[in-house]
C-alpha cells in the first residue's frame, strides 16, 4: 500500500490506521505499507525500514529504531517533537564517548529546572492540552521539547537544561554507543 491514508483528515486517518491494523492481524497477512508519516509508521508497523536515497538505512521494530537509531538520518525520522541535534558541548550531563560531534536529545533526554543555573531561555510555549511544546534557545541553538502543562513556566523564563542519556553521533553522522 502506497500512502493510502495521506489525503484523509486527521480523525479519519487515525480511525483507519486502527482498522487496517486490525484487519491485517485478523487475516494474518503481511502488509507492505509505504508512508512518509512517522505516526502511521510507528502505530501500524511491526517492523519499519527507513530508506534514504534508495538505500535501506535500518530495519527494526518502531521501538528499536526510535531508541537506537543507526545514524542521524534515522534519528530524525521518528519522534514528536523531532529530535534536537546539538553540538556535543552545548549542554551539561551525559557522558559523550570519544569522537562525539553531535548529541541527539529527545524529550526524554532533557531535564528542565526553572531558574536554577540557567543555560537556556524559553522562547515560546505551544499549549496542547495534555502537554506543552516548549521552544527553547540555548546559545545560538533552538530546541523543542515536551513539558507538563502544569509546569509553571512562561516565555522569557531562564531555565537549566541538562542531558540525561542522550544519543551520540560522530562526524559522519553514525551512532556511537
Where are these regions (language model features)?
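Secondary-structure boundary/capping residues
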Residues: 29-32, 83, 131
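Short glycine-rich loop/turn motifs that provide flexible caps or phosphate-binding loops at active sites
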Residues: 48, 59, 78, 87, ...
